[in-house]
Amino acid sequence: MTQFTSSAKILTYYADTMAVRQLCERFGGRLEKLSRHEKYRLCTGIALELIELSNPENDKVKDADYISHTTFGPDAVNQSRKILDNEKPAILALILPVIAEYARDDDRV
């Protein structure tokens, strides 16, 4: 039977890119303060948003009224969409193993 550890690995263990390094430098301290459950919810939320924003058939993303009422405004939504289009495989490759690790740990509790 495979043994899993609950010890945390640094984010750059999963993906060591300039974008990940900048993310760690900018938000690492705040992310460390989150509880385990909050980190799991954050990763899940990012993955779901990534899937939703990157779906070209999603009318919600194209809706100007939706975009104008987002927290970050239309420019940020459009910029995020461009980033997601270019980085989707890398982001999913980073987030999905983390979510799977949290799910395994939750199953053992």
Predicted feature descriptions by range:
Residues M1-V109:
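Short amphipathic alpha-helical interaction elements located at domain edges
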